[in-house]
């Protein structure tokens, strides 16, 4: 048995309506038939930009740990919808037209941590909440890091208080498994990093690897 998600355009779209649109997401309402001749059903969902997150990792001589154990760069940010300060990975929206996941990840790492990386790979791809949201999220691994000499980006609002912090990878993974880290991208990225590092980095995908992204979203609506 092959475990692989597959694209499916076989369902008949009867109607589509954009009910509301804001700067970050829109509310869409569709009517569709799951089977030919079946009664139509309605579904509402949020149309969202794609997003990226970055596991920035250092180890060996670059690590601050005595034994050279791997560390990941994390940030702590207030998230108003859940009323919580969350430990997260550097992350952001793919809201620039035509922008690749790699370019977006490079930008977010630079803007949020003043770091850049020479080596990039794809770690894991997820749909944040496929039952109600189109957001497609790619988590990338960034290594061979160096500090940006000049960063003109001004952090505002919740990002104004970002404090990038190096955390031992083992501690971060333990915190995720203990229910102390709740951000979905962070949990997925940390566990993926721990697993693939244990395999000697075998199986890492390229930064531009094929990606089963949502075909529609904030910028592109389905046509009848």
Annotate each predicted stretch with a short phrase:
Residues 31-36, 129-150:
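Active-site-adjacent beta-strand/loop module that shapes the phosphate/pyrophosphate-binding cleft
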Residues 14-61:
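Acidic, metal-coordinating catalytic segment for phosphate/diphosphate chemistry
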Residues 3, 46-48, 53-55, 65-107, ...:
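Conserved Nudix-box catalytic region and its N-terminal flanking loop in Nudix hydrolases
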Residues 15-18, 124-129:
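Short, solvent-exposed loop/turn elements at beta->coil junctions and helix N-caps
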């Amino acid at each position: 048995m092959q475990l692989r998600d597959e694209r499916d355009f076989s369902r008949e779209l009867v109607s589509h309506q954009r009910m509301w649109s804001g700067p970050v997401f829109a509310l869409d309402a569709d009517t569709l038939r799951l089977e030919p001749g079946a009664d139509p059903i309605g579904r509402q969902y949020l149309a969202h930009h794609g997003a990226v997150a970055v596991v920035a990792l250092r180890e060996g001589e670059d690590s601050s740990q005595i034994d050279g154990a791997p560390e990941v760069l994390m940030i702590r940010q207030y998230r108003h919808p859940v009323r919580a300060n969350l430990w997260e990975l550097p992350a952001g929206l793919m809201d620039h037209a035509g922008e690749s996941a790699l370019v977006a990840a490079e930008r977010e790492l630079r803007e949020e941590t003043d770091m850049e990386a020479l080596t990039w790979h794809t770690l894991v791809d997820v749909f944040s909440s496929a039952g109600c949201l189109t957001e497609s999220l790619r988590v990338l691994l960034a290594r061979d890091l160096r500090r940006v000499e000049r960063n003109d980006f001004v952090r505002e609002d919740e990002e104004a208080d970002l404090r990038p912090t190096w955390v031992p990878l083992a501690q971060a993974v333990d915190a995720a498994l203990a229910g102390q880290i709740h951000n979905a991208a962070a949990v997925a990225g940390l566990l993926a990093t721990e697993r693939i590092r244990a395999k000697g980095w075998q199986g890492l995908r390229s930064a531009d690897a094929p990606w089963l992204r949502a075909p529609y979203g904030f910028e592109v609506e389905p046509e009848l």
